[in-house]
Design a protein with these regions (language model features):
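Class I SAM-dependent transferase core
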Residues: 1-71, 75, 105-108, 112-122
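Conserved SAM-binding loop of SAM-dependent methyltransferases across substrates and taxa
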Residues: 81-94
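S-adenosylmethionine
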Residues: 94-98, 102-218
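Flexible, active-site-adjacent loop/turn segments at secondary-structure boundaries
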Residues: 18, 42-45, 51-52, 56, ...
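Conserved glycine-centered beta->alpha loop in an early N-terminal alpha/beta scaffold
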Residues: 78
Length: 218
């Protein structure tokens, strides 16, 4: 990792209340290098620069960290190249993380990173949360579900409902979201979920507005 990008990772993590130890920085460096290498042959991400990955994948993933308690069982829906689930596991080692994606090559990459970084308490699953077999395996299993790039918020909430424990939390990571849209979602989902919190912020080192929506299953 270039010194400039290392500094961006450190300062960006600090902005979210995370103090990255040297070992964590080295792990992120390995993740970064492997992602860029694999991405030359497999379309894992449209972001192809070190700086872009550090900001738009690593820091964006870490932005939700303070909303996830330790020892939480977390399902990352549509996890792609492992975001946000793998970075969250890297900094919150007590999490029990399940990654699920419908693209086998992306799941193969996730498994490669998990092995390379020797991460425990994390699994990568090839499948779709819409599939009956997946639902039967995962019904009422998770404290939290999270989605960063999977479908729209309403679809994510619908698919999460059976997989969450009662009182569990569905976390939607989204771009700029208006107050009107937030209130509309809250009203539409009122019978199944309660909007517990929503947080808007600007992603460090960018002008990108982001919104985190936390819905509690009723």
């Amino acid at each position: 990792m270039e010194p400039e990008n290392r500094e961006i990772l450190l300062r960006g993590a600090e902005a979210f209340g995370i103090d990255l130890a040297e070992g964590a920085i080295l792990a992120f460096d390995i993740y970064l290098r492997e992602l860029l290498k694999w991405n030359q042959k497999i379309n894992l991400t449209g972001i192809r620069t070190e700086k872009g990955v550090v900001i738009k994948h690593f820091l964006d993933s870490l932005s939700v960290c303070s909303h996830i308690p330790g020892h939480t069982s977390l399902l990352d829906v549509g996890s792609g190249a492992g975001f946000p689930g793998i970075p969250l596991k890297m900094v919150q080692t007590s999490l029990q993380v399940t990654l699920i994606d419908s693209v086998r090559k992306k799941v193969d990459f996730q498994k490669h990173i998990v092995r390379l970084l020797d991460l425990r308490g994390i699994e990568a699953v090839h499948g779709r949360v819409q599939e009956e077999e997946v639902v039967q395996e995962m019904v009422s299993r998770f404290d939290m579900t999270i989605s960063r790039a999977f479908s729209d918020t309403a679809t994510f909430l619908h698919l999460s409902h059976l997989l969450l424990k009662r009182g569990g939390m569905a976390i939607a990571m989204r771009g700029k979201t208006t107050e009107e849209d937030i209130q509309r979602l809250s009203k539409e989902e009122g019978r199944r979920y309660r909007l517990q919190k929503h947080v808007s912020f600007v992603l460090p080192f960018t002008n990108f507005e982001r919104t985190i929506l936390l819905f509690e299953k009723q």
